[in-house]
Amino acid sequence: MRPSKRAAQDLRPVTLERNVARYAEGSCLVKFGGTHVLCTASLEDKPPPWLRGQGRGWVTAEYAMLPRATHTRTRRESMSGKPSGRTQEIQRLIGRSLRAVTNLPALGERQITLDCDVLQADGGTRTAAITGAWVALHDCCKWMHGRSIIKEFPLREHVAAVSCGIYQGEAVLDLDYEEDSVAQTDANFVMTGGGALVEVQASAEGAVFSEDELSVLLALAKGGIAQLVNIQKLAIG
């Protein structure tokens, strides 16, 4: 039995609240159960220096956790001078996931930065961030398109992400911290609305896992991401 009493294939309650940041071109407060992430999209009217003159734009991401997002206070990474390896890995993952469904030439020579700040962490912060950041990016693109800054809407399709794992010998979807901290296998899946894979991260924590078990996790993720995409569609109207 899962601590939350959920069935193996059940997501936590998920909400996507748009337009929560007054000044950002797009914003979304995403909640996966007790994990809450604020995602904002900011438009810059220039691309990164290495992309100038190439006629296309860029989508990138930054990720951070507030000091009391966790049970005990965590020192701000900005105080140490640079982001941790974990933070760099997550923000690169978010950026890759969003670029996978974005027509970058349609942006022109512009950059959109997604800032994903974890307000409260209860497992699955990176998957929640990707799912919410897509909504913020969508609204930023809509803002640009509505003002004729761009001629073509640049988002090709949805992208969302979810965690899966093997907890007490059972494959389960969308682990919270209590499950994740003792899971035998931990995996994150990023997929498009059409069901194509963007990224798969899977690690043996307490015991190795088989190809068959990975297939079960993938099937759970497909079902979960289909639900998340439907929630995104309802959120954007």
Swiss-Prot record:
Enzyme class: transferase
Key words of the record: Nucleotidyltransferase, RNA-binding, rRNA processing, Transferase, tRNA processing, tRNA-binding
E.C. designation(s): 2.7.7.56
The reaction(s) this protein catalyses: tRNA(n+1) + phosphate = tRNA(n) + a ribonucleoside 5'-diphosphate
InterPro entries (alphabetical): ExoRNase_PH_dom1, ExoRNase_PH_dom2, ExoRNase_PH_dom2_sf, PNPase/RNase_PH_dom_sf, Ribosomal_Su5_D2-typ_SF, RNase_PH, RNase_PH_bac-type, RNase_PH_CS
Binding site for phosphate: R86, G124, T125, R126
Family note: Belongs to the RNase PH family.
PANTHER family xref list: EXOSOME COMPLEX COMPONENT, EXOSOME COMPLEX COMPONENT RRP41
Subunit (UniProt): Homohexameric ring arranged as a trimer of dimers.
Protein name: Ribonuclease PH
Gene source species: Beijerinckia indica subsp. indica (strain ATCC 9039 / DSM 1715 / NCIMB 8712)
Gene giving rise to this polypeptide: rph
